[in-house]
Protein backbone atom coordinates (compact mmCIF):
# COMPACT_ATOMS: atom_id res chain seq x y z
CA UNK A 1 0.00 0.00 0.00
CA UNK A 2 1.29 3.45 -0.92
CA UNK A 3 2.43 5.58 2.01
CA UNK A 4 0.33 8.71 2.53
CA UNK A 5 2.04 12.10 2.50
CA UNK A 6 -0.07 14.67 4.34
CA UNK A 7 0.38 18.44 4.53
CA UNK A 8 -0.90 20.80 7.20
CA UNK A 9 -1.15 24.54 6.55
CA UNK A 10 -1.77 26.22 9.89
CA UNK A 11 -0.51 28.20 12.87
CA UNK A 12 1.57 26.93 15.77
CA UNK A 13 0.86 25.97 19.37
CA UNK A 14 3.98 25.85 21.57
CA UNK A 15 2.03 23.90 24.21
CA UNK A 16 1.55 21.13 21.64
CA UNK A 17 -2.20 20.60 21.80
CA UNK A 18 -3.49 22.44 18.74
CA UNK A 19 -2.38 23.83 15.40
CA UNK A 20 0.58 22.46 13.46
CA UNK A 21 1.79 20.42 16.43
CA UNK A 22 -1.55 18.65 16.86
CA UNK A 23 -1.84 18.04 13.12
CA UNK A 24 1.59 16.43 12.84
CA UNK A 25 0.88 14.23 15.88
CA UNK A 26 -2.40 13.17 14.29
CA UNK A 27 -0.76 12.37 10.96
CA UNK A 28 1.87 10.24 12.70
CA UNK A 29 -0.67 8.47 14.91
CA UNK A 30 -2.69 7.52 11.82
CA UNK A 31 0.25 6.37 9.71
CA UNK A 32 0.75 9.37 7.42
CA UNK A 33 4.01 11.23 6.78
CA UNK A 34 3.51 14.84 7.84
CA UNK A 35 4.69 18.00 6.10
CA UNK A 36 3.87 21.51 7.34
CA UNK A 37 3.54 25.11 6.18
CA UNK A 38 3.31 27.69 8.96
CA UNK A 39 0.95 30.66 8.57
CA UNK A 40 1.33 32.21 12.02
CA UNK A 41 3.45 31.87 15.14
CA UNK A 42 1.00 31.77 18.02
CA UNK A 43 1.95 32.28 21.65
CA UNK A 44 -0.71 30.15 23.31
CA UNK A 45 -1.15 27.50 25.96
CA UNK A 46 -3.97 25.63 27.67
CA UNK A 47 -5.20 28.91 29.18
CA UNK A 48 -5.57 30.90 25.97
CA UNK A 49 -3.85 32.89 23.24
CA UNK A 50 -1.35 35.50 24.37
CA UNK A 51 -0.03 36.80 21.04
CA UNK A 52 -0.09 36.12 17.28
CA UNK A 53 2.73 36.84 14.83
CA UNK A 54 1.45 36.48 11.27
CA UNK A 55 3.87 35.14 8.67
CA UNK A 56 4.32 37.30 5.57
CA UNK A 57 2.05 35.98 2.78
CA UNK A 58 4.99 35.77 0.35
CA UNK A 59 6.82 33.50 2.77
CA UNK A 60 3.73 31.32 3.21
CA UNK A 61 3.66 31.02 -0.59
CA UNK A 62 7.39 30.20 -0.64
CA UNK A 63 6.85 27.38 1.87
CA UNK A 64 4.04 25.99 -0.27
CA UNK A 65 6.26 26.11 -3.35
CA UNK A 66 8.99 24.23 -1.46
CA UNK A 67 6.61 21.42 -0.56
CA UNK A 68 4.52 21.15 -3.73
CA UNK A 69 7.51 21.33 -6.09
CA UNK A 70 9.24 18.41 -4.41
CA UNK A 71 6.90 16.20 -2.37
CA UNK A 72 3.92 14.20 -3.64
CA UNK A 73 1.12 15.45 -1.39
CA UNK A 74 -1.79 13.02 -1.17
CA UNK A 75 -3.93 15.00 1.24
CA UNK A 76 -3.96 18.46 2.82
CA UNK A 77 -5.45 19.99 5.95
CA UNK A 78 -5.82 23.78 6.23
CA UNK A 79 -6.23 25.40 9.62
CA UNK A 80 -5.49 28.92 10.84
CA UNK A 81 -5.01 31.40 8.00
CA UNK A 82 -5.07 34.60 10.09
CA UNK A 83 -5.60 37.26 7.40
CA UNK A 84 -6.85 38.01 3.90
CA UNK A 85 -3.51 37.99 2.08
CA UNK A 86 -2.61 34.57 3.52
CA UNK A 87 -5.98 33.18 2.40
CA UNK A 88 -5.25 34.54 -1.08
CA UNK A 89 -1.74 33.04 -1.13
CA UNK A 90 -2.98 29.59 -0.13
CA UNK A 91 -5.90 29.67 -2.58
CA UNK A 92 -3.59 30.66 -5.44
CA UNK A 93 -1.08 27.87 -4.74
CA UNK A 94 -3.78 25.21 -4.38
CA UNK A 95 -5.08 26.21 -7.80
CA UNK A 96 -1.62 26.45 -9.39
CA UNK A 97 -0.55 22.98 -8.26
CA UNK A 98 -4.02 21.41 -8.69
CA UNK A 99 -4.03 20.04 -5.14
CA UNK A 100 -6.69 17.41 -4.36
CA UNK A 101 -8.15 16.04 -1.09
CA UNK A 102 -8.18 19.32 0.83
CA UNK A 103 -9.85 19.56 4.25
CA UNK A 104 -10.51 23.11 5.47
CA UNK A 105 -10.94 23.58 9.20
CA UNK A 106 -12.63 26.98 9.23
CA UNK A 107 -10.66 28.24 12.24
CA UNK A 108 -11.98 31.58 13.46
CA UNK A 109 -11.83 31.35 17.25
CA UNK A 110 -9.57 29.50 19.67
CA UNK A 111 -11.20 27.28 22.31
CA UNK A 112 -10.58 30.16 24.73
CA UNK A 113 -12.60 32.51 22.51
CA UNK A 114 -9.60 34.41 21.14
CA UNK A 115 -9.97 35.43 17.44
CA UNK A 116 -7.73 33.58 14.95
CA UNK A 117 -9.09 34.98 11.66
CA UNK A 118 -9.65 38.65 10.87
CA UNK A 119 -13.24 39.55 9.88
CA UNK A 120 -12.06 40.86 6.50
CA UNK A 121 -10.57 37.46 5.69
CA UNK A 122 -13.88 35.62 6.05
CA UNK A 123 -15.27 36.98 2.77
CA UNK A 124 -12.07 36.03 0.94
CA UNK A 125 -12.12 32.55 2.45
CA UNK A 126 -15.74 32.21 1.35
CA UNK A 127 -15.16 33.30 -2.24
CA UNK A 128 -11.61 32.11 -3.00
CA UNK A 129 -10.99 29.02 -0.88
CA UNK A 130 -14.31 27.26 -0.33
CA UNK A 131 -14.82 26.37 -4.02
CA UNK A 132 -11.41 24.65 -4.08
CA UNK A 133 -11.68 22.41 -1.03
CA UNK A 134 -13.02 18.87 -0.69
CA UNK A 135 -14.49 19.23 2.81
CA UNK A 136 -15.06 21.97 5.37
CA UNK A 137 -15.54 21.25 9.08
CA UNK A 138 -17.29 24.23 10.72
CA UNK A 139 -18.76 24.25 14.18
CA UNK A 140 -21.98 26.20 14.61
CA UNK A 141 -20.43 29.64 15.33
CA UNK A 142 -18.10 29.24 12.34
CA UNK A 143 -20.96 28.19 10.06
CA UNK A 144 -22.90 31.27 11.15
CA UNK A 145 -19.92 33.51 10.37
CA UNK A 146 -19.44 31.96 6.93
CA UNK A 147 -23.12 32.45 6.12
CA UNK A 148 -23.40 35.84 7.85
CA UNK A 149 -26.38 34.35 9.67
CA UNK A 150 -27.51 33.79 13.27
CA UNK A 151 -25.99 30.90 15.24
CA UNK A 152 -28.03 27.70 14.71
CA UNK A 153 -29.85 26.77 17.93
CA UNK A 154 -31.64 23.60 16.80
CA UNK A 155 -30.69 20.59 14.74
CA UNK A 156 -33.11 21.67 12.02
CA UNK A 157 -31.38 25.06 11.76
CA UNK A 158 -28.06 23.20 11.64
CA UNK A 159 -29.33 21.15 8.69
CA UNK A 160 -30.45 24.25 6.82
CA UNK A 161 -27.08 25.94 7.33
CA UNK A 162 -25.17 22.84 6.24
CA UNK A 163 -27.11 22.75 2.98
CA UNK A 164 -26.44 26.45 2.43
CA UNK A 165 -22.70 25.93 2.96
CA UNK A 166 -22.62 23.05 0.48
CA UNK A 167 -24.29 25.32 -2.07
CA UNK A 168 -21.33 27.71 -1.76
CA UNK A 169 -19.22 25.32 -3.81
CA UNK A 170 -17.13 23.13 -1.51
CA UNK A 171 -17.10 19.38 -2.11
CA UNK A 172 -18.67 18.41 1.21
CA UNK A 173 -19.54 19.85 4.63
CA UNK A 174 -19.17 18.27 8.07
CA UNK A 175 -21.23 20.39 10.47
CA UNK A 176 -20.13 19.81 14.05
CA UNK A 177 -22.97 19.99 16.55
CA UNK A 178 -20.99 20.17 19.77
CA UNK A 179 -22.50 23.58 20.57
CA UNK A 180 -26.04 22.15 20.57
CA UNK A 181 -27.58 21.28 23.93
CA UNK A 182 -27.76 17.59 23.05
CA UNK A 183 -26.28 14.58 24.85
CA UNK A 184 -25.50 12.88 21.53
CA UNK A 185 -23.47 15.80 20.10
CA UNK A 186 -24.75 15.20 16.53
CA UNK A 187 -22.62 15.95 13.49
CA UNK A 188 -24.05 16.11 9.96
CA UNK A 189 -22.23 15.29 6.74
CA UNK A 190 -23.49 16.96 3.57
CA UNK A 191 -22.27 15.74 0.18
CA UNK A 192 -23.57 15.87 -3.39
CA UNK A 193 -24.84 12.32 -2.86
CA UNK A 194 -26.83 13.01 0.30
CA UNK A 195 -26.77 13.68 4.04
CA UNK A 196 -25.79 11.53 7.00
CA UNK A 197 -26.06 11.99 10.76
CA UNK A 198 -23.27 10.91 13.11
CA UNK A 199 -23.59 10.69 16.87
CA UNK A 200 -21.26 9.89 19.72
CA UNK A 201 -21.79 10.14 23.48
CA UNK A 202 -20.28 13.26 25.01
CA UNK A 203 -17.05 12.40 26.81
CA UNK A 204 -16.90 14.10 30.17
CA UNK A 205 -13.55 15.87 30.17
CA UNK A 206 -12.54 19.51 30.25
CA UNK A 207 -9.45 18.65 28.20
CA UNK A 208 -10.63 19.41 24.69
CA UNK A 209 -7.89 21.79 23.52
CA UNK A 210 -7.22 21.19 19.83
CA UNK A 211 -10.15 18.86 19.12
CA UNK A 212 -11.13 20.76 15.95
CA UNK A 213 -7.56 20.74 14.65
CA UNK A 214 -7.20 17.07 15.50
CA UNK A 215 -10.45 15.99 13.84
CA UNK A 216 -9.74 17.85 10.59
CA UNK A 217 -6.19 16.45 10.49
CA UNK A 218 -7.57 12.94 11.06
CA UNK A 219 -10.07 13.41 8.23
CA UNK A 220 -7.26 14.48 5.92
CA UNK A 221 -4.97 11.62 6.94
CA UNK A 222 -7.69 8.98 6.56
CA UNK A 223 -9.40 10.19 3.38
CA UNK A 224 -7.00 8.46 0.92
CA UNK A 225 -7.83 5.11 2.55
CA UNK A 226 -11.55 5.36 1.87
CA UNK A 227 -13.74 5.77 -1.19
CA UNK A 228 -16.16 8.21 0.44
CA UNK A 229 -16.42 10.84 3.15
CA UNK A 230 -18.93 8.92 5.27
CA UNK A 231 -16.49 6.08 6.04
CA UNK A 232 -13.70 8.60 6.59
CA UNK A 233 -15.79 10.58 9.08
CA UNK A 234 -16.81 7.43 10.95
CA UNK A 235 -13.20 6.30 11.45
CA UNK A 236 -11.93 9.79 12.32
CA UNK A 237 -14.66 10.37 14.92
CA UNK A 238 -14.05 6.97 16.50
CA UNK A 239 -10.32 7.66 16.79
CA UNK A 240 -10.95 11.14 18.23
CA UNK A 241 -13.35 9.72 20.82
CA UNK A 242 -10.58 7.43 22.06
CA UNK A 243 -8.14 10.36 22.15
CA UNK A 244 -10.65 12.38 24.21
CA UNK A 245 -11.33 9.46 26.54
CA UNK A 246 -7.62 9.34 27.42
CA UNK A 247 -7.11 13.12 27.59
CA UNK A 248 -7.15 13.30 31.39
CA UNK A 249 -4.17 10.94 31.64
CA UNK A 250 -1.83 13.54 30.10
CA UNK A 251 -1.99 16.21 32.83
CA UNK A 252 -0.74 18.98 30.51
CA UNK A 253 -1.15 22.60 31.64
CA UNK A 254 -3.48 24.29 34.10
CA UNK A 255 -6.32 25.18 31.72
CA UNK A 256 -8.08 23.26 28.95
CA UNK A 257 -5.64 20.44 28.22
CA UNK A 258 -5.07 18.56 24.95
CA UNK A 259 -6.42 15.23 23.74
CA UNK A 260 -4.12 12.19 23.78
CA UNK A 261 -3.06 11.76 20.16
CA UNK A 262 -0.92 8.71 20.93
CA UNK A 263 -3.41 6.90 23.15
CA UNK A 264 -2.87 3.66 21.21
CA UNK A 265 0.82 3.55 22.18
CA UNK A 266 1.24 5.02 25.65
UniProtKB/Swiss-Prot annotation:
It catalyses: 4-amino-5-hydroxymethyl-2-methylpyrimidine + ATP = 4-amino-2-methyl-5-(phosphooxymethyl)pyrimidine + ADP + H(+); 4-amino-2-methyl-5-(phosphooxymethyl)pyrimidine + ATP = 4-amino-2-methyl-5-(diphosphooxymethyl)pyrimidine + ADP. CDD domains: HMPP_kinase. 4-amino-5-hydroxymethyl-2-methylpyrimidine binds at residue 44. One of its GO terms (cellular component) is cytosol. It is an enzyme of class 2 (transferase). GO terms for biological process: thiamine biosynthetic process; thiamine diphosphate biosynthetic process; thiamine salvage. One of its GO terms (molecular function) is hydroxymethylpyrimidine kinase activity. Keywords: ATP-binding, Kinase, Nucleotide-binding, Thiamine biosynthesis, Transferase. Its EC number is 2.7.1.49, 2.7.4.7. Pathway: Cofactor biosynthesis; thiamine diphosphate biosynthesis; 4-amino-2-methyl-5-diphosphomethylpyrimidine from 5-amino-1-(5-phospho-D-ribosyl)imidazole: step 2/3; Cofactor biosynthesis; thiamine diphosphate biosynthesis; 4-amino-2-methyl-5-diphosphomethylpyrimidine from 5-amino-1-(5-phospho-D-ribosyl)imidazole: step 3/3. Belongs to the ThiD family. Catalyzes the phosphorylation of hydroxymethylpyrimidine phosphate (HMP-P) to HMP-PP, and of HMP to HMP-P. Shows no activity with pyridoxal, pyridoxamine or pyridoxine. Monomer. This is Hydroxymethylpyrimidine/phosphomethylpyrimidine kinase. It comes from Escherichia coli (strain K12).
